């Protein structure tokens, strides 16, 4: 019986996931659109910055891992523009602690650095010369609602709600990050 359950679990991992496929398709479209000049003059780099919100830490980690794998296997094209430009998943717990099946522990310093390197113009510290200290290292940020309040991510061009929270005000808070 346990062997059969293990087989079922393995085959369920191979089943197509239409929701993830739709996310990947949306990212392709957004990256392609960011390549074209915009009438407002907004930079291509800022327009392809995307925040993907999910309610659950497990989902955030899964999305991150699957996107990283997809980007590394795709030929040169729109979604491969994001290769090596996806930040570590941001949730309310350390990724290593979460993978061990435990919860708790928030890496505030690491989160602040990631945010500053995702949106250096709006979320990083300013040095004495008036320039942002963060580097523009990331274009995709996958996060739980831990980043839905009190974080200035206005440099991002898009928000994707991978799943919807039970409280509709959470959606308003998520969208308030980019105006």
Model-derived segments and spans:
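SF2 helicase motor core recognition
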Residues: 61, 126-136, 141-156, 176-178
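Conserved SF2 helicase motif VI
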Residues: 167-179
């Amino acid at each position: 019986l346990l062997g059969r359950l293990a087989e079922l679990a393995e085959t369920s991992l191979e089943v197509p996931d239409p929701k993830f496929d739709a996310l990947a398709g949306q990212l392709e479209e957004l990256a392609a659109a960011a390549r074209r000049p915009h009438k407002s003059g907004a930079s291509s780099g800022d327009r392809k910055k995307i925040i993907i919100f999910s309610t659950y830490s497990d989902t955030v980690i899964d999305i991150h891992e699957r996107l990283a794998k997809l980007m590394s296997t795709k030929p040169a094209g729109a979604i491969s523009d994001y290769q090596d430009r996806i930040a570590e998943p941001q949730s309310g717990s350390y990724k290593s602690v979460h993978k061990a099946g435990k919860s708790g522990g928030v890496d505030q310093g690491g989160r602040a650095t990631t945010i500053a390197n995702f949106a250096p113009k709006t979320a990083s510290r300013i040095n004495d010369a008036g320039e942002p200290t963060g580097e523009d290292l990331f274009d995709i940020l996958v996060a739980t609602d831990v980043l839905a309040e009190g974080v200035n991510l206005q440099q991002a061009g898009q928000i994707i709600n991978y799943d919807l929270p039970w409280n509709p005000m959470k959606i308003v808070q998520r969208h308030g990050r980019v105006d």
